[in-house]
Amino acid sequence: MLQPLFAMANTSPDQLAVPGGIVKIAVADKSQTAPTVLFNNNRVAVSKNNSHWFALVGIPLSAKAGTQQLLVNNSQKLSFTITDKDYPAQYLTIKKKRMVTGFTEQDLKKINADKIAISKAKAIWTEQAINTDFIAPVDGRLSSLFGLKRFYNNIPKRPHSGLDIAAPTGTAILAPASAIVIDTGSYYFNGNTVFLDHGQGLLSAYLHMNKITVKPGQQVKQGEPLGTVGETGRVTGPHLHWMVYLNNTPVDPALFIAKDIPRL
């Protein structure tokens, strides 16, 4: 059975305190008002559990091992420690060479415009209660893990910032939790993409889609269709690249769902 993150009673934040992971930290006791929490100048999601407030913090893949700090209500500083994690390398061959090198002027204009649109989408913050009760968004095979050091045609690129689930073109992609559609678009690298808002900076994104069946501003419930699996953008075959953001930071989506997805 899939479990919401806050229901994982046996999960210690220390076990998740790695680059690309998450930490859950008690930030206030018995206050009726939600505290304002910042990490690296980004708002952090908070949730009340048994009369205590907790912050759910996303750790950047670029974070270094050691002590980190939260700023609570612009006055109190809370420290926590993260440990290092060595993500393995992955080498992929991309047949469309212009998806890796040799971009035209028109390509670069599109890529730059996409960066602006994506940055705007993933910076969204709404005050609605955070919803971490996730299910897997597609029925498929887990084909590429989060955090891998990516090499395209032997050229080093940014680490893999999502979870790849391989499935045939046309396979339904479902909302993992109730949400509001932030935006949709067709991007150079990401292909057809949907962004969802699950509250307080918890966002999710669905890349390389074939068809998109939702519109910006639309409310979706858990299990409702967002579109279908495809192979648009920079891909090696049909799959869903699923991303989850906390405080404007990509984190491992596997932390939000059961660990028994079939793997390679």
Protein language model features and the residues they cover:
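Residue-level recognition of beta-strand microenvironments
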Residues: 145, 184-185, 209-212, 229-232
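Zn2+-dependent peptidoglycan hydrolase active-site motif and core
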Residues: 176-210, 238, 243
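Terminal peptide-recognition signature
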Residues: 41, 70, 142, 165, ...
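Cationic-aromatic interfacial patches
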Residues: 7-88
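Short, well-structured beta-strand-loop connectors
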Residues: 172-182, 214-229
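N-terminal signal peptide c-region/cleavage motif recognized by signal peptidases
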Residues: 2-4
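Surface-exposed, glycine-biased beta-strand/turn segments
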Residues: 79-190
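Conserved, short, structured surface segments that act as functional micro-motifs
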Residues: 193-197, 218-264
